[in-house]
UniProtKB/Swiss-Prot annotation:
Identification of the protein by name: Gas vesicle ATPase GvpN
Function (record text): An ATPase that functions in gas vesicle formation. A minor component of the gas vesicle, also found in soluble extracts. Gas vesicles (GV) are hollow, gas filled proteinaceous nanostructures. During planktonic growth they allow positioning of the organism at a favorable depth for light or nutrient acquisition.
Enzyme Commission designation: 3.6.4.-
Subunit structure: Forms homodimers, probably interacts with other GV proteins including GvpA.
Molecular function via GO: ATP binding; ATP hydrolysis activity
Family: Belongs to the CbbQ/NirQ/NorQ/GpvN family.
Main localization category: other
PANTHER family: MIDASIN, MIDASIN-RELATED
Gene Ontology terms: cellular component: cytoplasm; gas vesicle; preribosome, large subunit precursor
Length: 335
């Protein structure tokens, strides 16, 4: 991902395809979202924290192959943070003494208008990714209504520019938001939601999470699957379902992969890493969380032992069958 300087020194992003993990579940959501975007409709990705909304939004923006403006919702935002404001002055002074007996003096002060991200994206036809837009107050986001529906952006009166900006046909917006029960999140006005195509982002399935861990941390598949199953079981047992477990999985997997820590129940270090990362996401007491976690480790340890026994039994059966086959072949050979 690189930044490029454009009008008024505003930085835009030019995305480079990264390690975006594509599984059937993710691909279905991405295809749906791209259909709406290519038809000119803004897309709203809604879901709990950690479900990959921002990552998918950046992937969709990359697929549109246009420069990207990235904007993060903020409770302190004002309308000027979206559309721009007058910043600084230009001082022009002209002294005309062409006729020596006549002195003409012109002194002019003029305010400079600086576009903000929304205005620049509307003017140039960029893709705007508005991350966690419902952290901004609803009245601030009202400036989006006319831009999305009538394709006209209303600007404050200024001597340097017109009061209305016609939106570039290539302008696209991708919104992301967290549930309203999250701290610091505002209710979104119905008028804005009515203009968006909202896609609910579910918790990534085990296959998707496993593939993400493998590609992002270079951990082996068996260890990645073990971490995903352990984190999912712990979250279900403790009722910590408000957020996604994907971030926890990534943190555990990266630490284990970077420090060559075995991902097994017999490892001395792995349980400590899992406890440090998982327990602060649980609303239960330390003793309750510890009891649940130890029970899960015992359960997973028994499962590992059963799998190992099945493998050994299968290998022994293969050796016995192979030995019998060889004996039969030797018995059938002529002396």
């Amino acid at each position: 991902m690189t930044t490029t300087k454009v009008n008024h020194k505003r930085a835009v992003l030019r995305l480079r395809p990264g390690q975006f993990v594509v599984t059937p579940a993710i691909e279905r959501v991405a295809i749906r979202a791209l259909r709406y975007l290519k038809s000119g409709f803004p897309v709203h990705l809604r879901g709990p924290a950690g479900t990959g909304k921002t990552t998918l939004a950046m992937h969709l923006a990359n697929c549109l192959d246009r420069p990207v403006m990235l904007l993060f919702g903020d409770d302190q935002f004002k309308s000027s943070d979206l559309i721009g404001s007058e910043s600084g002055y230009t001082h022009k002074k002209v002294l005309d003494n062409y006729i020596h007996s006549v002195v003409k003096l012109e002194d002019e002060f003029k305010q400079n208008w600086v576009d903000s991200r929304l205005t620049l994206a509307c003017r140039e036809g960029f893709t705007l990714v508005y991350d966690e837009f419902n952290r901004s107050r609803p009245e601030v986001n009202n400036v989006l209504l006319s831009a999305l529906e009538e394709k006209i952006l209303s600007l404050p009166p200024s001597s340097n520019q017109p009061e209305y900006l016609s939106v570039n046909p290539q302008f696209r917006v991708i919104f992301t938001s967290n549930p309203e029960e999250y701290a610091g999140v505002h209710s979104t006005q119905d008028a804005l939601m009515d203009r968006l195509v909202t896609i609910s982002m579910p918790e990534p399935d085990e296959i998707t999470q496993t593939e993400i861990l493998i590609q992002k941390t270079n951990i082996d598949r068996e260890s990645a699957n073990f971490i995903v199953r352990l984190v999912k079981s712990f979250r279900l047992a403790t009722g910590a379902e408000k957020t996604s477990g994907l971030r926890s999985c990534l943190m555990i997997a990266k630490v284990c992969a970077d420090n060559n820590i075995p991902v097994t129940t017999e490892s001395l270090d792995f349980p400590d890493i899992a406890i440090d990362i998982l327990f602060n996401r649980s609303h239960l007491s330390m003793s309750e969380s510890t009891n649940i976690f130890l029970e899960l480790l015992d359960k997973f340890s028994a499962e590992e032992l059963e799998i190992l026994n099945n493998r050994v039994t299968g290998d022994n059966d293969f050796l016995i069958d192979n030995s019998q086959f060889v004996s039969q072949q030797l018995a059938g050979q002529p002396n």
